[in-house]
């Protein structure tokens, strides 16, 4: 339907179907998270991931147990469109979308094999578009772009977001000038927490009545992330 086509095509953090756009309600319509409404390490305000951004998580050491937790999250949360409220007159769905231009990831010689395995899994198994960048060659990485931090900042304009996993000082000012958000958090051992950071959160609010009649009006289907 037209509504479903619109929901799959429009690029925004909050979508409103057959209703006004006044929202920003905790849990029901969390806000932000897209484009210039997202700066640094953040998540939708009032959403399921927001509290997790307010604490530090231990850095990952082993890929396989982290992947197991990430896989479980993808099955039970990430791949679905979830309505936490269950109202009969309105759907308030939370789902995840892919970055259209992908993420530019800064790594270094000290980046562990387990971290590289995670980045490879994101790209090859989940279809997350990433490009790896470093200031020097790293053995075994054929698709690595070797460049300075200044060159990195210029190339970042081609991407939606930056993930900085290097001990270097990131060119935050240059990135901010170009409207590019930079996430400097290390990869965490919590797979369910970490994998959500590589997707966009989206809230979709759909009116399910016509003048108070819950059996009238369009009933568009809102799908979750295609994995």
Stretches with model-predicted labels:
Residues 1-227:
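Conserved C-terminal structural/oligomerization subdomain of aldehyde/semialdehyde dehydrogenase
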